[in-house]
Amino acid sequence: MRRINSLYGRIGLLKRVPEKSTKQAHTFLASLSFSTEGAYGGDGEFQQNSSKVKIFDRDLKRIHRDRAAWLSRQKNDSFVDAVADNLLDRLEDCKKSFPTAFCLGGSLGAVKRLLRGRGGIEKLIMMDTSYDMIKSCRDAQDDSLDNSIETSYFVGDEEFLPVKESSVDLIISSLGLHWTNDLPGSMIQCKLALKPDGLFLAAILGGETLKELRIACTLAHMEREGGISPRLSPLAQVRDAGNLLTRAGFSLPGVDVDEYVVKYKRAMDLIEHLRAMGETNALLERNKILNRETAVATAAIYDSMFATEDGTIPATFQVIYMTGWREHSSHPQAKRRGSATVSFTDLQKQFGGQS
């Protein structure tokens, strides 16, 4: 578990990339985007399925991202940076290079700023549903950035990736994919967009995120309104992450979890931080009106139940890190069932065990 006490430290602006690089990104864009309204069939193809359930309001989430671009301008978020840096650390464990990288939504600026030459990236393509977020990232400048990386930007949707199959070497998504209505479908599209032996890296918020706020909200609603109203969005559980990677068809899947505890002076500071990250509620079936008495009760319950000795209140963020590779002949393959030439009984006898 990691503890982060300070937020919003100032940083320099990001390096502006020439507009001409945007045109070169079209080499990787398909004329028709993949469709997420489908399922992964046994033949390895993405198949149509009209029964997709919509949980999140994607238009509202785009508005949240637009607002976050304005709120987070010229500011450094310690939590967002820690997650992005931890995710990118996995590139240091890879011996190969990834010339073409595709970054999906989430903390675009942090990923770009913290790459620091990792992964041998030569071309970086950055996509977000929010035009304002893309513009903010593109227009920023930072002398610490690697100018040798050719960077392009465009607006797109994680649910309909406008990328050609087998066109990129690396896909990175830091704190972005958990807002998709069809997470398995989005991951399948990511897998198809990768070249053979391409790498998928993602960090999403897990189900234990904001558990303190969930408890406080539930108790406040029961006390003031006599029932429960969904105020926080549902998130994937750790046990689901491995199944998601396997269902998407990734080989050598890997999942690990980290918890970050961020401290705030008051409950309103937590809400402001969530807005600055674009992480506020986007449920389709949400109560759009928050009773003032319920809000005050939530803050009071939060403080009484979870306040620490130093007067701050903690908020837990559970981050699930996922890695997966597109299949390649160089990857280890499981042996066919029944192909073993030595039995466990023989091994036990050989090493002096008792039967």
From Swiss-Prot:
Known EC number: 2.1.1.-
Where does the record say this protein resides?
A: Mitochondrion
Q: Name one GO biological process term.
A: methylation
Task: Spell out where the chain crosses the membrane.
Answer: none
**Could you tell me which InterPro entries the record lists for this protein?**
Malonyl-ACP_OMT, Methyltransf_11, SAM-dependent_MTases_sf
- What's a Pfam family in this record? Methyltransf_11
Give the family from UniProt.
Belongs to the methyltransferase superfamily.
**Per UniProt, which keywords does this protein have?**
Methyltransferase, Mitochondrion, Transferase, Transit peptide
Record protein name field: Putative methyltransferase At1g22800, mitochondrial
Q: Which Gene3D superfamilies match?
A: Vaccinia Virus protein VP39
Any Gene Ontology CC annotation:
mitochondrion
Tell me, what is one Gene Ontology molecular-function annotation carried by this entry? S-adenosylmethionine-dependent methyltransferase activity
Q: Where is the transit peptide?
A: 1-34
